[in-house]
From Swiss-Prot:
GO terms for cellular component: cytoplasm. The gene is rnc. The active site is at residues 43, 115. Gene3D superfamilies: 3.30.160.20, Ribonuclease III domain. This is Ribonuclease 3. Its cofactor is Mg(2+). Belongs to the ribonuclease III family. The keyword Cytoplasm applies. NCBIfam families: RNaseIII. Homodimer. Digests double-stranded RNA. Involved in the processing of primary rRNA transcript to yield the immediate precursors to the large and small rRNAs (23S and 16S). Processes some mRNAs, and tRNAs when they are encoded in the rRNA operon. Processes pre-crRNA and tracrRNA of type II CRISPR loci if present in the organism. HAMAP family: RNase_III.
């Protein structure tokens, strides 16, 4: 498993039980034994790790400021960027349909895989060791983050911008839901007054899909 050796070097952790790593890399479209339970565990550990790091780093910030910074650091976009650093797209096991549709590049799948790897590391070792590795992944991001307006989520920032311009609020509509109840993928379209196009967000929940669409609009409007 030379290719997994390379991946383990990139993430900074060597698995004792490679089966856990393989499961973390397996999307539900590829096998009955997949990474969603590991993702659930990894999500909790990630939030704990980043929450603790921010609590210690910013002793004078209130709960709202800490929550917004944590949301920025654990959001899909940030996790997908970490996945690109690890070249996770080259290691994931995807079903034929997901491969054909470019699932190895999809931010939601990459982000879920990062969380699954965190969950797998915790089962392979222990919580303190896993948190230490995650803090190492986030070293630069934690160093650079600061409380402030840019920590608000995309939907909030878009709404405040439109209100400031006295424009109508965005309209979000779910246009498609795929998958079974416990593992659905939502497609959301968003329309904004004075922008002659439709923006589409796809994610594992309606809320996340709306955030993806809102972030696309912010980019078009050049709002940082």
């Amino acid at each position: 498993m030379k290719h997994l050796d390379r991946l383990q070097h990139k993430i900074g952790y060597e698995f004792s039980n490679l089966t856990l790593l393989k499961q973390a890399l397996t999307h539900r479209s590829a096998a009955k034994v997949h990474n969603e339970r590991l993702e659930f565990l990894g999500d909790a550990i990630l939030n704990l790790t980043i929450g603790e790091a921010l609590y210690l780093q910013f002793p004078h910030c209130n709960e709202g400021e800490l929550s917004r910074m944590r949301a920025t650091l654990v959001r899909e976009k940030t996790l997908a960027e970490l996945a690109h650093q690890f070249d996770l797209g080259n290691y994931m096991a995807l079903g034929a349909g997901e491969l054909k549709s470019g699932g190895f590049r999809r931010a939601s799948i990459l982000a879920d895989c990062v969380e699954a790897i965190i969950g797998a590391m915790s089962l392979d070792s222990n919580l303190p060791k896993t948190m230490e590795i995650v803090r190492r992944w986030y070293e630069v991001l934690l160093r650079d983050i600061q409380p402030g307006e840019n920590q608000k989520d995309p939907k909030t920032r878009l709404q405040e911008y439109l209100q400031g311009k006295r424009l109508a609020l965005p309209a979000y509509n779910v246009t498609d839901i795929q998958g079974e109840a416990h593992c659905q993928t939502f497609t959301v379209e968003c329309h904004v007054e004075n922008l002659d196009r439709t923006f589409v967000g796809v994610a594992g929940s309606r809320r996340k899909a709306e955030q993806v669409a809102a972030e696309q609009i912010l980019k078009v409007l050049d709002i940082k």
